[in-house]
A protein has these predicted regions:
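Trp/Phe/Arg-rich N-terminal binding region typifying the photolyase-homology
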Residues: 1-176, 281, 352, 371-376, ...
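Repeat-unit-sized solenoid/scaffold elements
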Residues: 116-132, 364, 445-458
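Active-site-proximal binding-pocket segments
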Residues: 27, 91, 247-446, 450
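Charge-dense, low-complexity intrinsically disordered segments
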Residues: 66, 70, 217-220, 224, ...
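Alpha-helical packing segments of well-folded alpha/beta enzyme cores
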Residues: 36, 75, 79, 226-233, ...
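Short secondary-structure transition/capping segments
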Residues: 93-109, 131-143, 182-197, 408-414, ...
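Glycine/tryptophan-enriched, flexible segments
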Residues: 146-312, 438-469
Length: 469
């Protein structure tokens, strides 16, 4: 069922007499539990027209590189296959997404688009809505409770949002049934050059993107791989999640954040799967999946400066400014941080984990961000450095969750703590706390092993390595 609160008409134009209904897929790169896709199918059937799914592949998406594109194309290749199985044609074009959407809209009776929350995604949808000749309808499918339903303003913390979401959760946590298209569109010919992604290496080679950040061997894109990880998490990790999720030397997290970032798996699908499990620890995981993740969507939607130092609350800005004059024992350049060349072996291990795997343990992400603040000339420089490294190397970089996570390291969605040098009233973390709580030697050994394995895996062995989920 698709509730009306998920649906928003973006312009005041009408459905017109054109040959197709078009779904512009952008943030929700999946065929399962995709409200935008199911809405588009429903409208196509009602209008007795075939459905076309369009995806625009640009060389110029901000800060994206080979690592991100490879993972995304692995997922899109699977999407195209699954859509064909459902008799739906998918057109992938090498073009700026909004321009391609506008071009194909000239053939559309109706345009449907999934919802995005970042600045560029909202700009793209506005451009299409303003310039398309037909009605443009946006369907919200990458959160459980729609952002504007959950709250009409930027929330101060998880505490202030949690109750608001809880009150509406049952209303929106409804199963979504797949519909069949009445019209088969797979053999339709449209006057557009399609971008072939069957051979992903070849497709990547033809893109003018940053190829210095290579694909990772530890995660393979696509809904099917996300579902394998989810089943493994539920079966083998969830029962110890609360106890062990913060232990860097162990892997009791779900590994689903890259898949959620690219919309390759639905948070609603995850929630419904967990509702069938009678494990107490699921509450802790659902706090991360729903409250924390949707708090990040609230942050980037309501705060125009979400990727800037100025997004921080006034108390954090004031206290960090007050402590600008404090002496820093260590100051590292961007190059030293990027290459994990600090005096702190724990921090270096976390940075190397990000470089090698495209992910970083959640608890270490907090420590990582706090230390960048401590080791930079100014907190604003630290903020920009953290954003740069996060977006460049993490598979889930450039994500609302990442922007909120970095902001948290500097005081966002947190409260003032005891005052100390450099940090002021911002929460402090140090290596002694890590050593006291966790098996950090084992964590460092784990990352060293990853580095060694990554170095010796040949191209011929990649397929085998990727199957070891």
């Amino acid at each position: 069922m698709i509730l009306q609160d998920r649906i928003k008409v973006l312009n005041n134009k009408k459905t017109i007499d054109n040959p197709y209904v078009v779904y512009w897929m952008q943030c929700s790169q999946r065929t399962e539990y995709n409200h935008a896709l199911e809405y588009a199918i429903m409208q196509a059937n009602e209008l007795k027209k075939p459905l076309i799914v369009y995806f625009g592949l640009t060389d110029n998406y901000p800060e994206a590189n080979e690592r991100h594109y490879y993972f995304m194309l692995e997922g899109l290749k699977e999407v195209k296959t699954e859509l064909a199985r459902r008799n739906i044609k998918m057109i992938i074009r090498k073009i700026s997404p909004e321009n391609g959407a506008l071009e194909i809209s000239s053939f559309a009776a109706l345009m449907v688009v999934d919802r995005g929350y970042l600045r560029i995604e909202r700009k793209w949808r506005t451009l299409l809505a303003q310039n398309a000749k037909c009605s443009v309808v946006q369907v919200e499918t990458n959160v459980i409770v729609p952002v504007e339903v959950a709250s009409i303003k930027e929330e101060y913390s998880a505490y202030t949002l949690r109750n608001k979401i809880s009150k509406r959760l049952e209303e929106f946590a409804l199963p979504l049934n797949e519909r069949e298209c009445d019209e088969d569109s797979t053999n339709l010919e449209l006057p557009f050059d399609e971008y072939d992604i069957e051979d992903i290496d070849k497709a990547i080679s033809q893109l003018k993107i940053d190829k210095t950040v290579k694909r990772v061997l530890y995660y393979k894109g696509g809904t099917s791989n996300a579902k394998i990880l989810l089943e493994e998490f539920i079966s083998n990790k969830l029962s110890h999640y609360s106890e062990l999720k913060n232990e860097p030397s162990k892997t009791y997290f779900s590994d689903l954040s890259p898949y959620l970032h690219f919309g390759q798996i639905s948070p609603l699908y995850i929630y419904i799967k967990l509702m069938d499990v009678s494990i107490e620890d699921k509450k802790a995981f659902l706090e991360e999946l729903i409250t924390r993740r949707e708090l990040s969507m609230n942050f980037v939607f309501y705060n125009d400066k979400y990727d800037c130092y100025e997004s921080l609350p006034s108390w954090a800005l004031n206290t960090l400014d007050k402590h600008l004059v404090d002496e820093r024992e260590f100051i590292y350049s961007l190059q030293e941080l990027e290459t994990a060349q600090t005096h702190d072996d724990y921090w270096n291990a976390a940075q190397n984990e990000m470089l090698i795997t495209g992910k970083m343990h959640g608890y270490m992400r907090m420590y990582w961000g706090k230390k960048i603040l401590e080791w930079s000339k100014t907190p604003k420089e630290a903020y920009n450095t953290a954003i740069y490294l996060n977006n460049k190397y993490l598979l889930d970089g450039r994500d609302a969750n990442g922007f909120a996570g970095i902001a948290w390291c500097f005081g966002k969605h947190d409260r003032p703590w005891g005052e100390r040098a450099i940090f002021g009233l911002v929460r402090f973390m140090n290596d002694k706390g890590l050593k006291r709580k966790f098996d950090m030697e084992r964590y460092m050994h784990k990352i060293e092993s990853m580095s060694y394995n990554s170095a010796i895996i040949s191209d011929n062995e990649k397929t085998e390595q990727l199957s070891l989920f």
